[in-house]
């Protein structure tokens, strides 16, 4: 394997390992978000525990980890798929060396990689996520359904690598959301405070 590819994979993993939510929480709020809410260090739990501003910052930072990593092949002038290099950042986000290998669910970082690989596909994926989130008011549902639909839509792009990576990530996202799936079945899944699902739950509790 080319030494540059190895170097890119290492850099990508280290970038992905940056625990944005943990660092933002500790530095600015004196909180380790892994001890609150769902215990996850990702964007959703950051919104829930630290608020909107911190959540947006962590979302952008987590996406940026994937975006920067996906740009490495262009920076190093190496002809290798940005998706494959981007996977190293996703792996780092899920198993971060800087946070005891307790990471997030890789949704934002995956989207960041997709932005570089195919902006059109990124736009489609983002639109699916937003629409699904508005309907369900559940980030978990939007993530799982979004990745599923993205995998199906990727078939129409005639890009084998994209389809394979999309399917692998979909399976992985479902595996990382198994606790959420149980809560969805029990009707106890956390909701964001907007959208049709949230309004329906609020109406039923009155």
Swiss-Prot record:
Entry's EC annotation: 2.3.1.275
One protein family per Pfam: G3P_acyltransf
Metabolic or biological pathway, per its Swiss-Prot or TrEMBL entry: Lipid metabolism; phospholipid metabolism
Gene designation per UniProt: plsY
Cellular component GO terms held in the UniProt record: plasma membrane
Superkingdom of this protein's organism: Bacteria
Xref: PANTHER family: GLYCEROL-3-PHOSPHATE ACYLTRANSFERASE-RELATED, INNER MEMBRANE PROTEIN YGIH
Any one biological process term the GO annotation gives: phospholipid biosynthetic process
Keywords: Cell membrane, Lipid biosynthesis, Lipid metabolism, Membrane, Phospholipid biosynthesis, Phospholipid metabolism, Transferase, Transmembrane, Transmembrane helix
Cystine bridges: none
NCBIfam families noted in UniProt: glycerol-3-phosphate 1-O-acyltransferase PlsY
SMART domains according to UniProt: G3P_acyltransf
Name under which the protein is recorded: Glycerol-3-phosphate acyltransferase
Subunit structure: Probably interacts with PlsX.
UniProt-recorded Gene Ontology molecular function terms: acyl-phosphate glycerol-3-phosphate acyltransferase activity
Family statement drawn from the similarity comment of this UniProt entry: Belongs to the PlsY family.
Reactions catalysed, as given in the entry: an acyl phosphate + sn-glycerol 3-phosphate = a 1-acyl-sn-glycero-3-phosphate + phosphate
